[in-house]
Design a protein with these regions (language model features):
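Sec-dependent N-terminal signal peptides
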Residues: 4-13
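Aromatic-Pro/Gly-enriched surface loop or interdomain linker
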Residues: 17-88, 92-95, 185, 193-194, ...
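Short alpha-beta junction capping motif
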Residues: 36, 88-127
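An acidic, glycine-rich "communication" segment
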Residues: 44, 126-202, 210-215, 219
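Extracytoplasmic/secreted envelope proteins and their assembly/folding machinery
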Residues: 51-58, 104, 108, 126, ...
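Surface-exposed patches in mature extracellular/periplasmic domains of secreted proteins
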Residues: 67-77, 119-122, 140-148, 231
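Alpha-helical scaffolding within the catalytic cores
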Residues: 71-78, 100-106, 170-174
Length: 231
């Protein structure tokens, strides 16, 4: 399973960032370093939360898979013409998100054309994120993914689904998704706070085994998303 998935990701990383190549007119299509794009948004929420998390995750991806990924993520807005060079978009924060009509249209097109969004609830994100997803896809609702979904078994095994990393309200961790033509385009990690577990070891009081679960799930998400990019 691991070797097959890595082969798919290696092939995908050599191809165009958007699988079917239908980037909108005016969008720049250049060879970009393989990395995670962190979404900047308006509305008052701290999109920049957990600043050491993504660099640490990228380091673990390099170490565990051998993929040549960048040392740091890029920070990007939905209106940036380089958006289509990054098939993995990451969103986090504690507060409110608000997209403009233009951003909604871009995100809808980005996801329909092969992009992947991972939204990581850093506590306090849930209400506004669900609202904005209804604006992106008015005819869809986020659905909870079963524990046998491939994202939980892409590289590491999570037989019980999304791991619980930070306690917050003590609610169980849940993974939700939105689909386009059978493809998972949005993964929403709720009441898990993976980014908390990716942060520097001295930042929070997470034990090593909890941080390990967070990194493993992060590797799964990255590889799963990139394996969907086909030449």
């Amino acid at each position: 399973m691991k070797s097959t998935l890595l082969a798919a990701v290696l092939l995908a990383s050599l191809s165009a960032p958007v699988p079917d190549g239908r980037a909108p007119e005016g969008a720049e299509r250049v060879r970009a370093e393989l990395t995670i794009a962190q979404l900047q948004y308006d509305g008052g929420g701290d999109w920049y939360a957990n600043p050491s998390g993504l660099p640490n995750l990228l380091a673990e991806i390099r170490k565990r898979t051998g993929l040549r990924v960048a040392e740091r993520p890029v920070q990007i807005r939905l209106t940036d013409p380089n958006l289509y060079n990054y098939p993995y978009l990451y969103l986090t924060g504690h507060g409110n998100i608000r997209f403009t009509p233009e951003e909604l249209q871009v995100l809808r097109q980005y996801l329909a054309n092969g992009g992947f969004l991972h939204a990581d609830d850093n506590y306090g994100l849930d209400e506004s994120f669900r609202r904005e997803m209804r604006r992106v896809f008015p005819d869809q609702e986020l659905v909870e993914l079963p524990a046998d979904h491939p994202v939980y078994h892409a590289f590491y095994e999570f037989p019980d689904g999304l791991p619980k990393i930070h306690q917050h309200d003590g609610k169980p961790a849940q993974g939700f998704g939105l689909f386009q033509e059978g493809r998972l385009v949005v993964f929403y990690s709720y009441e898990s706070d993976l980014g908390n577990g990716w942060e520097d070891a001295d930042r929070y009081d997470n034990p090593p085994e909890t941080r390990e679960k967070a990194f493993r799930m992060g590797v799964n998400l990255f590889l799963y998303a990139l394996a969907q990019v086909t030449p």
